[in-house]
């Protein structure tokens, strides 16, 4: 990824980002600066574009036929959609943890080692595996069964294994798309505790429908909503309503729709 002459103090900046699928606009005109080593939550009702936006930050949407982005996504001063940028390298630097735990059909050890090996890691693999699992708060539960399948773990443990797998390739940013939605409350608490520790070393962006979770784990919050498209087209378009420090948004939101959403009046 070659440096461009784009100045930013943020880890990731979205500059007038709009995303469409074919002729249908999914989300429009998003401006937002994601601060380094902070947790930013994306909240909003279903269909508002928050998952579409988070997947644009590491070019996962490139894999969807007909998906087009306008505007700029700037990462560490680089326009990641510039022609000379390798999307594979973008995805290494900006990792993703998905909604459903998706360990590889390999041993716990190989779930960590495989990606690191593919990305050319030449260091002490045993140490990397231990450090990654420790940072994801799952080492104590895995250390005596590293050769067992990743599928042998509980759902919450599998999700922390997936976080450890992401950590092992040494990204700068970790994206989490509703990482706790399929988990029980105790497993959710473990993930949230892990997020608090991870922000010491990583910038984290999390999509969540859980307002209490957004309030607990994030430093900043972006609230997305929808508006109706042209009546002849049908459907809705997502847009960013408000972006602020989480404590400000939850205590004194600037927009009435933000207040209505976080208080449970719609969503």
Curated annotation (Swiss-Prot):
Binding site for ATP: 44-51
GO CC, one annotated term: plasma membrane
Catalytic reaction list: phosphate(out) + ATP + H2O = ADP + 2 phosphate(in) + H(+)
ABC transporter domain location: 12-251
Gene Ontology annotations of biological process type: phosphate ion transmembrane transport
Listed InterPro entries: AAA+_ATPase (IPR003593), ABC_transporter-like_ATP-bd (IPR003439), ABC_transporter-like_CS (IPR017871), P-loop_NTPase (IPR027417), PstB-like (IPR005670)
EC number(s) stated in the UniProt entry for this protein: 7.3.2.1
Compartments it resides in: Cell inner membrane
The keyword Nucleotidyltransferase is annotated on this UniProt entry: no
Membrane topology reported for the UniProt record: Peripheral membrane protein
Entry keywords, A to Z: ATP-binding, Cell inner membrane, Cell membrane, Membrane, Nucleotide-binding, Phosphate transport, Translocase, Transport
Pfam families xref list: ABC_tran (PF00005)
GO molecular function annotation: ATP binding; ATP hydrolysis activity; ATPase-coupled phosphate ion transmembrane transporter activity
Similarity comment: Belongs to the ABC transporter superfamily. Phosphate importer (TC 3.A.1.7) family.
Quaternary structure and interacting proteins, as annotated: The complex is composed of two ATP-binding proteins (PstB), two transmembrane proteins (PstC and PstA) and a solute-binding protein (PstS).
NCBIfam families: 3a0107s01c2
Function, in words: Part of the ABC transporter complex PstSACB involved in phosphate import. Responsible for energy coupling to the transport system.
Name of the molecule in the record: Phosphate import ATP-binding protein PstB
Gene assigned in the entry: pstB
């Amino acid at each position: 990824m070659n440096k461009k002459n784009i100045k930013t103090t943020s880890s990731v900046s979205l500059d007038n980002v709009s995303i469409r699928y074919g002729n249908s606009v999914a989300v429009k005109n998003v401006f937002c600066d994601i601060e380094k080593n902070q947790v930013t939550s994306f909240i909003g009702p279903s269909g508002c574009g928050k998952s579409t936006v988070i997947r644009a930050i590491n070019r996962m949407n490139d894999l969807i036929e007909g998906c087009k982005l306008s505007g700029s996504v700037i990462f560490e001063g680089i326009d990641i959609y510039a022609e000379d940028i390798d999307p594979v390298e973008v995805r290494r630097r900006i990792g993703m943890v998905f909604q459903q735990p998706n360990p590889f059909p390999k041993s716990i050890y190989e779930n960590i080692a495989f990606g690191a090996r593919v990305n050319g890691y030449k260091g002490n693999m045993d140490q990397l595996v231990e450090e990654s699992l420790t940072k994801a708060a799952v080492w104590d539960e895995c250390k005596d069964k590293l050769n067992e399948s990743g599928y042998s773990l509980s759902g919450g443990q599998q999700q922390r294994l997936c976080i450890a797998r992401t950590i092992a390739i040494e990204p700068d940013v970790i994206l989490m798309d509703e990482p706790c939605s399929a988990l029980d409350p105790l497993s959710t608490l473990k993930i949230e505790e892990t997020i608090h520790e991870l922000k010491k070393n990583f910038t984290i962006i999390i999509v969540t429908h859980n307002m209490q979770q957004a309030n607990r784990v994030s430093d900043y919050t972006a609230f997305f909503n929808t508006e109706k498209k042209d009546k002849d087209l049908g459907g809705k378009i997502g847009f960013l309503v408000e972006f602020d420090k989480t404590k400000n948004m939850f205590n004194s939101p600037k927009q009435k729709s933000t207040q209505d959403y976080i208080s449970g009046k719609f969503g």
